[in-house]
């Protein structure tokens, strides 16, 4: 069905600059690329070897930054650095900046990576290092086209130079987008992944069901052991 001009304009206004839609990934051409046949155990082992080191590294970097900024705010130092970060993360207050910078538990990132990339087998991951299904609306940035369209619109996803860059972009998106304000508010107060995933209903077209699925993935695979 072809979108009207009004629908297209509304879509661009309502959808965050970086749009993440897990339920649309297969339909728009993120189906598995040609890989050697693997058992479920082999597929999960490959996923962990590829993804978890990058998530560990980015999480540690972000936590160091968060703690440094928190200390600077208490001491009233590094004002230039604080102001630059507020601009980058669209934070108006010190508290909003801390909300933006605090990284959420790794178990959530791992579970989302597994879901969005079909355990690192999706085309978008293997051709563009895009493990979290991040959409692109900037024609000047590196990106990859989906194989199918939404109406007459080509769907574009970001292309990253590395898995680590994809992880860093994912955390930055959740730290900046207005769609995840409630998620940020809660993650400043708690590190409980099962409470936090309930606030990711706007990450996916699945809505509240998305959080339930993440909870199941975390529990079944014991991803909370990485927190």
PLM regions and their residue ranges:
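Catalytic cores of secreted/periplasmic lytic hydrolases that degrade extracellular macromolecules
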Residues: 2-111, 115-227
């Amino acid at each position: 069905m072809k979108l009207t001009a009004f629908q297209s304009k509304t879509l661009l206004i309502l959808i965050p600059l970086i749009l993440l839609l897990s339920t649309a990934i297969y339909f728009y051409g993120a189906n598995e690329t040609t890989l050697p046949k693997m058992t479920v155990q082999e597929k999960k082992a490959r996923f962990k070897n590829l993804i978890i080191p990058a998530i560990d590294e980015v999480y540690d970097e972000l936590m160091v930054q968060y703690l440094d900024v928190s200390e600077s705010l208490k001491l009233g130092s590094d004002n230039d650095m604080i102001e630059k970060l507020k601009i980058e993360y669209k934070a108006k207050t010190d508290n909003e900046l801390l909300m933006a910078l605090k990284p959420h538990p790794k178990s959530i990132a791992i579970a989302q990576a597994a879901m969005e990339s079909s355990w690192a087998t999706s085309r978008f991951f293997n051709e563009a290092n895009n493990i979290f299904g991040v959409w692109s609306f900037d024609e000047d940035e590196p990106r990859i086209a989906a194989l199918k369209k939404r109406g007459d619109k080509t769907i574009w996803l970001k292309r990253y130079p590395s898995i680590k860059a994809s992880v860093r972009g994912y955390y930055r998106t959740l730290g900046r987008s207005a769609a995840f304000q409630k998620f940020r508010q809660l993650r400043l107060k708690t590190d409980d992944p099962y409470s936090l995933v309930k606030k990711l209903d706007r990450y996916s077209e699945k809505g509240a069901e998305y959080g339930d699925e993440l909870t199941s993935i975390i529990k079944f695979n014991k991803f909370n052991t990485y927190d």
